[in-house]
Amino acid sequence: MRKDIHPDYRPVVFLDTTTGYKFLSGSTKSSKETIEFEGETYPLIRVEISSDSHPFYTGRQKFTQADGRVDRFNKKYGLKDANAAK
């Protein structure tokens, strides 16, 4: 087996930016941001949707404030919502 070809697998804190929920998990993702979590310092990865805010896992519909790419495009060019016209 060749050495040094696999990324480092380490504990990382994920922060759900919608709800503020934080959880510790293993990941190969890297980040320059760090956070103090349970007395230790870990790299911080920000996510828009996690198991705390996704309707499939919560069992209820939550509306998030995060706009999608289509919404940002429509706002930028002043287009009206195509679904609202129907």
Swiss-Prot record:
Gene Ontology terms, MF aspect: structural constituent of ribosome
Any one of the GO CC terms: ribonucleoprotein complex
Keywords: Ribonucleoprotein, Ribosomal protein
InterPro entries in the record: Ribosomal_bL28/bL31-like_sf (IPR034704), Ribosomal_bL31 (IPR002150), Ribosomal_bL31_B (IPR027493), Ribosomal_bL31_sf (IPR042105)
BP-aspect Gene Ontology terms: translation
HAMAP family for this protein: Ribosomal_bL31_2 (MF_00502)
Family: Belongs to the bacterial ribosomal protein bL31 family. Type B subfamily.
Subunit structure: Part of the 50S ribosomal subunit.
Name recorded for this polypeptide: Large ribosomal subunit protein bL31B
Species for this entry: Streptococcus uberis (strain ATCC BAA-854 / 0140J)
